[in-house]
């Protein structure tokens, strides 16, 4: 992680769970971290978990990644304040409690796609343009899911697996576009199994399933960022021991 000391990381969905763990660990590792979230006060509260030397490196910014105008304003702010972004972690993701074949739920399903897919794409576009403009060999990390590779039968998953399958395809498309452009920017998909987070249905927790913790995924992010410039971890799958899915 030495090469990233003092560099700028943008983390979406930074207010809780995986995003909060990643935000905290990147700041501890010496990066300047811009944590994006709708609940910005919860990102600000993460400073309590940081050593005094790291607290000034964490910047909490209100942003709803389902809104393109929010994304545009945030990346303009990052460019003005810090010069640009070196690492992007697309972590923001939502799951709505409904069925795919339900009724009067079109808005709920669109919210999932707008956040999990379009938010990821639009943030990646802004980060890439920032890296390209400054000739930075940066890194874009997508927090994907095992359901982005295989659809499992669990209640009210609705359009969530489709949104994560999109992330898998988007990762490969980005890799191809970066290669064709002669870019040294890396792109990585990290696909966790079941993680104990706020969006995890209570039925999974109460069912006694094996669970990962948010910190396990954050450690994976640190690992992929710490690889040599010649190494790209394209896909990393992480499951808890004994997972049924």
Swiss-Prot record:
Tissues with expression: Highly expressed level in the midgut and brain in adult females, and at lower level in the abdominal and thoracic ganglia. High levels are detected in corpora allata (CA), Malpighian tubules and fat body.
Catalysed reactions listed for this entry: (2E,6E)-farnesol + NADP(+) = (2E,6E)-farnesal + NADPH + H(+)
GO molecular function list: farnesol dehydrogenase activity
Residues that coordinate or bind NAD(+): 11-40, 64, 164
Keyword entries, A-Z: NAD, NADP, Oxidoreductase
Signal peptide: none
SUPFAM superfamilies: NAD(P)-binding Rossmann-fold domains (SSF51735)
Enzyme Commission no: 1.1.1.216
Residue positions binding substrate: 145
Residues forming the catalytic site: 160 (proton acceptor)
A Gene Ontology BP annotation from the UniProt entry: juvenile hormone biosynthetic process
Gene3D superfamilies: NAD(P)-binding Rossmann-like Domain
Pfam (any one): adh_short
pH dependence: Optimum pH is 10-11.
Function, as annotated: Mediates oxidation of farnesol into farnesal, a precursor of juvenile hormone in the corpora allata (CA), the glands that synthesize juvenile hormone. Able to oxidize C(10) to C(15) isoprenoid and aliphatic alcohols.
PANTHER family referenced in this protein's UniProt entry, alphabetically: DEHYDROGENASE/REDUCTASE SDR FAMILY MEMBER 11, DEHYDROGENASE_REDUCTASE SDR FAMILY MEMBER 11
Complex and partners: Homodimer.
Similarity comment: Belongs to the short-chain dehydrogenases/reductases (SDR) family.
Name this polypeptide is given: Farnesol dehydrogenase
